[in-house]
Amino acid sequence: MSLLLLGAASQVNAAEDHSVISAELLPTSLQTSWQVNKPQLGKFGHCAAAFDSRTDDSKMAFACSIYVKLEAVAQRKAIQHCDEQRAARNIKAPCQLIK
């Protein structure tokens, strides 16, 4: 039983390691994307974003993980999808979870 609890605790800690950004601090186009996706997030969904420019959409990445049953999974998938976009667009800034 204690092994199971340790595993769950490590998953929670891993989920908390992602940096977070307030939606108000995002560039306008990312704020719009956030507002469009926010109602669909449900209890566990998360979105992540990265940007090197506040005006050039080609220097922005945005991804959400919506249909999941665990918050840690949603966080991890949102960051993963954002990182894929970030790499494809050569964005230097790290992906951050949006709160």
Task: Walk through the language-model features, giving the residues of each.
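Sec-dependent signal peptide recognition
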Residues: 1-3
